[in-house]
């Protein structure tokens, strides 16, 4: 049994990707502690979840996003975690996403710890979000990307959350890394079973479109309300949104303005845990998971966790076409696809998925077994 220190730059309350990888290692007999950065200091500093200890660092309140205060907060978190782990080194350090990778690199250098890097996202793309024309931000993003790739090469095992499917045409994060001389294994962020509660394939007078997850941009919700407006009044769905994030206030303000104008009911709430997801999705008929493709991580293979989680409850998801998430969605019959910006297509596809049910058949078991084998070989 090995002691594993996982590091993540959010409060892990919850972070499905982090907790699934932690549970996987714990179920194989390893002792896992998640070192999480609770920027808003709103979660317990220490708790045990499914045999995994989550240790949250409260070092003052800090923002999310790409602001200077965010970077200062991350530096303070990294400094504190390094001190903690150097005082009592684990057998392995496991870094989730590039904003924690410097911690693992330093621990590997100073103590010789094996380093696992799990890439769920392309960190440098966040710098240009909302500022696609900024020359300065583009320059900074390239600098960050170069630094991240240099650090990733120092990892002993690299895991990504997406990769091209067999006979597919769209690349994933694994393929993004390959031209840079980095080999990675894919472990997609899938639930390990279908829930007992499944959406029923039946005609209902009222129906609901839901978005359950991080709220990072307003554009998808502007597009959603435009699509709903395109539907006949009697066919318009209620809207349910749950989750926190950098744009949650702006999105709430937008929906509070648009819902009365469209004549639809609105249900809004903030962060939720795994049990909360089960409750929230009970009345959702279609999950909405569309994103601006100008975000680099969308074009380069991001797969929305909510698509797999919704499917485990029988709920279809609407995602972007012309990228990996759309290809996976169609290949596994998990919902519908529409082109970003095509309001008519989005409206039509939402309506088409209204009474459908889906079945998640792939739980990523083979990927997980391959990962455990590689992890234990590393140790």
Predicted regions and their residues:
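A short, active-site helix/loop in glycosyltransferases that binds the activated sugar's phosphate group
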Residues: 141-184, 191-193
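N-terminal subdomain of nucleotide-sugar transferases
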Residues: 1-42, 46, 157, 163, ...
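A charged, aromatic-enriched C-terminal amphipathic alpha-helix characteristic of glycosyltransferases
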Residues: 340-347, 352-379
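Conserved donor-binding/catalytic core segment of Leloir-type glycosyltransferases
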Residues: 159, 191-193, 200-229, 240, ...
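Short hydrophobic beta-strand element within catalytic cores of glycosyltransferases
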Residues: 286-289, 309-319
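Glycosyltransferase donor-sugar binding loop
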Residues: 212, 238-252
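Nucleotide-activated donor-binding/catalytic signature segment of Leloir-type glycosyltransferases, i.e.
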Residues: 252-281, 286
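Membrane-proximal helix-turn-helix segments that form the acceptor-binding/catalytic region
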Residues: 79-86, 102, 106-110, 117, ...
């Amino acid at each position: 049994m090995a002691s594993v220190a996982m590091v993540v730059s959010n409060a892990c309350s919850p972070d499905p990707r982090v907790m699934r990888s932690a549970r996987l290692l714990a179920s194989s007999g390893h002792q896992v502690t998640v070192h999480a950065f609770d920027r808003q200091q709103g979660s317990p500093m220490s708790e045990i979840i499914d045999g995994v200890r989550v240790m949250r660092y409260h070092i003052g309140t800090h923002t999310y996003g790409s602001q200077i205060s965010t970077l200062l907060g991350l530096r303070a978190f990294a400094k504190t975690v390094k001190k903690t782990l150097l005082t009592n080194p684990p057998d392995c350090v496991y870094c989730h996403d590039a904003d924690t990778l410097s911690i693992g690199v330093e621990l590997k250098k100073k103590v010789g710890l094996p380093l696992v890097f799990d890439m769920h996202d392309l960190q440098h793309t966040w710098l240009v979000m909302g500022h696609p024309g900024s020359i300065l931000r583009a320059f900074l993003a390239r600098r960050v990307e170069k630094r991240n790739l240099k650090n990733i090469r120092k990892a002993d095992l690299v895991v990504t959350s997406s990769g091209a499917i067999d006979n597919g045409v769209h690349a994933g994060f694994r393929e993004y890394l390959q031209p840079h001389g980095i080999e990675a294994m894919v472990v997609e962020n899938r639930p390990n079973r279908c829930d007992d509660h499944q959406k029923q394939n039946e005609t209902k007078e009222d129906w609901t479109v839901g978005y359950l997850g991080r709220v990072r941009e307003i554009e998808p919700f502007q597009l959603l309300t435009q699509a709903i407006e395109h539907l006949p009044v009697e066919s318009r769905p209620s809207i349910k949104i749950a989750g926190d994030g950098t744009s949650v206030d702006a999105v709430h303000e937008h929906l509070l303005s648009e819902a009365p104008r469209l004549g639809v009911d609105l249900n809004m709430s903030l962060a939720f845990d795994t049990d909360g997801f089960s409750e929230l999705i009970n009345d959702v008929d279609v999950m909405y998971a569309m994103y601006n493709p100008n975000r680099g991580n969308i074009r380069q293979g991001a797969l929305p966790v909510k698509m797999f989680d919704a499917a485990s409850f029988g709920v279809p998801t609407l995602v972007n076409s012309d990228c990996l998430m759309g290809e996976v969605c169609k290949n596994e019959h998990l919902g519908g696809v529409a082109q970003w910006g095509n309001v008519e297509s989005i409206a039509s596809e939402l309506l088409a998925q209204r009474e459908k049910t889906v079945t998640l058949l792939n739980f990523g078991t083979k990927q997980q077994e391959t990962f455990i084998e590689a992890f234990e070989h590393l140790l």
